[in-house]
């Protein structure tokens, strides 16, 4: 009897590990897709004023798990002739003003609320929480019918001196000022 209980406990643990592995794989896939979206957002946008010209395009996030995936996905890619540097940043650090694009995952929403947005005047701001654009962001990811979609606040991008291609904007849900 003890052997049977031990067997079923082992099977239960294995099933839990399998579910955890599947969830981790889905999270990696979602992060990889979002990294690809970020690449294309940057590729099809023009910065009228560079955040800080340093000889490379700097994609930042406070989320090290996302950055691990993004580093792999964006390896040896270029944006406007510049290599991509993926960087871990603290949202309360002055270093965020050196980012061309900042991606804030849902885990860092509370820190985003208190982030000094004046440090990010010419940085493309992308997030994934429902209120991200309302809290000063430019682009927000959301899920619709199990697919990753995005919405853009073009007027907010314009204030940051960033112009996004009309082709990309046509693929998005547009958020107008006051609708946020």
Residue positions per predicted region:
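Short hydrophobic alpha-helices and adjacent helix-cap/hinge residues
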Residues: 2-9, 22-180
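N-terminal signal peptide c-region/cleavage motif recognized by signal peptidases
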Residues: 17-21
